[in-house]
Regions:
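N-terminal cap/lid segment of alpha/beta-hydrolase-fold proteins
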Residues: 19-43
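C-terminal catalytic histidine-bearing segment of alpha/beta-hydrolase fold enzymes
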Residues: 33-36, 91-98, 231-286
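Mobile cap/lid helix-loop segments that gate and shape the active-site cleft of serine hydrolases
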Residues: 26, 169-206, 212
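Conserved alpha/beta-hydrolase "acid-adjacent" motif
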Residues: 223-232
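Short beta-strand/loop motif that positions the catalytic acidic residue
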Residues: 210, 215-218, 222
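Primarily recognizes the serine-hydrolase "nucleophile elbow" in alpha/beta-hydrolase
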Residues: 110-180, 198
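Short beta-strand element of the alpha/beta-hydrolase
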Residues: 45-53
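Catalytic nucleophile-loop/oxyanion-hole region of alpha/beta-hydrolase
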Residues: 60-67, 83-124, 263-267
């Protein structure tokens, strides 16, 4: 039977099971961000932190979270589904963060770096990240900005993921191809017009030669995130010589994750293509 455990189980080394662990528990950070582990039978091939999408305002906890974790575990990976901080439905509706504050950059990447740190402290194998839509922007941010410890608590634990898989990702914060809702969710009300911030979080501008290998997927008919986002990232990865594989499907749409009910004939292949890719890559730790 597939075991669904949490990082807390690994940390405490007990037979107690809890479905989630609060990643900031015991720190001065007041956030409810959580991590749930889906573990394979036997030694994992690698660990993958999974970041669901949701425009940086909410999260698709099932199709891009739970189902992804279950699938990865069934294929021999230790999957850790991260419920990171988002702007939230209230702030999406009422635009209150400009006055009262709330979750915004760098809260999201701090959560992902914290998750990578906690997993690495318990597991010495490869640790990567997979994200969907806005979650794709988040995991690619981790692949580019690992030189900055947004958690202020890594204490020497490497923050660079060993591989990343942005799936139909948001990439740019620049017009005209940005996903405006994700930009607002990430930057926060009152900062969306700040061109310096837009540029600093437009990932096509910050690819590093030492960024980890990338599995990139996009669909030509994506009605939510302009697929040109992925094209910009693909070009930047090529320019910097970063090992990557880009998968382009003519028909697939957006938001399918690991939900087979949303697959097209083309997107039904994406999981197998990811498994083929990860079996071939050189993790090339730095």
């Amino acid at each position: 039977m597939r075991r669904i455990l949490t990082l807390l189980f690994l940390v405490l080394g007990t037979a107690l099971q809890a479905q989630t662990v609060k990643i900031w528990e015991g720190t001065s950070v007041h956030a409810g961000s959580s991590l749930t582990a889906y573990l394979p039978e036997g030694e994992p091939k690698a660990a993958v932190v999974v970041c669901p999408g949701g425009s940086y305002f909410w999260l698709d906890k099932e199709g891009e979270g739970e189902l992804v974790g279950e699938w990865l575990a069934s294929e021999g990976f230790a999957a850790y589904v991260l419920l990171y901080r988002t702007g939230g439905w209230f702030n999406f509706t009422f635009h209150t963060r400009a006055v009262f504050g709330g979750n915004r950059h760098p809260d999201m990447i701090a959560d992902l770096q914290r998750a990578i740190t906690l997993v690495r402290r318990q597991y010495d194998g490869p640790v990567g990240a997979m994200g969907f839509s806005a979650g794709g922007h988040l995991v690619m941010s981790a692949a580019e900005f690992f030189g900055t410890d947004f958690t202020e608590r890594a204490a020497g634990t490497p923050l660079r993921p060993d591989f990343v898989a942005p799936i139909y990702p948001v990439v740019s914060m620049r017009d005209p191809c940005t996903h405006a809702r994700s930009r607002r969710g990430l930057l926060g009300d009152g900062r969306t017009g700040n061109q310096v911030m837009r540029d600093s979080l437009s990932l096509e501008c910050h690819v590093r030669p030492d960024s980890p290998p990338v599995f990139l997927l996009r669909c030509d008919d994506d009605p939510v995130v302009d697929p040109h986002n992925a094209d910009l990232l693909d070009a930047a990865l090529t320019e910097k010589g970063v090992p990557h594989r880009t998968i382009r499907y003519p028909v697939g749409g957006h938001g399918f994750g690991a939900n087979k009910e949303k697959f097209t004939e083309e997107t039904a292949r994406w999981q197998a293509e990811f498994l083929d890719w990860i079996a071939e890559i050189d993790y090339g730790r730095h």
